[in-house]
Amino acid sequence: MSMIEFHDVNKYFGKFHALKNINLTVDRGEVVTIIGPSGSGKSTLLRCINGLERITSGQLIVNDFDLADKKTDMNRIRKNVGMVFQHFNLYANKNVLQNVTLGPDLVLKRNKQEVEQEAHDLLKMVGLENKADSFPGELSGGQQQRVAIARSLAMQPKAILFD
């Protein structure tokens, strides 16, 4: 069963044709890597899957929802599709634990104690259990990336996109 389907998807930024007639199916549980030079549309493709960019034409189905349909609840899509950005987008004024727990607490409205325990487990999984009280500015780039991964996993998504 497919998780993501592109059918003749195009994306324009003004006159620039960023995605041209993309056809791709990603099945549940499948791992896919998109490679290409800088500026080839990899980030744009991921941002379309997560609903951060709208496609210009074609059909994009994510988890059985048609993203070209303006009635589709994009927040519901984003709850099920995690994203780890190139620049991680961590909150500089929040410590590592707060960065990981913010989504499940505010967006999913989950029990704060459960969320914190799961966050500690995730931080242990990514080798940062001793950094829960540190702030992003105190971490190396690799450590920040692992916090971003833990933060994405904390939302229990059905898919995770890595840019």
Question: Predicted segment positions?
Answer:
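ABC family nucleotide-binding domain
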Residues: S2-F162
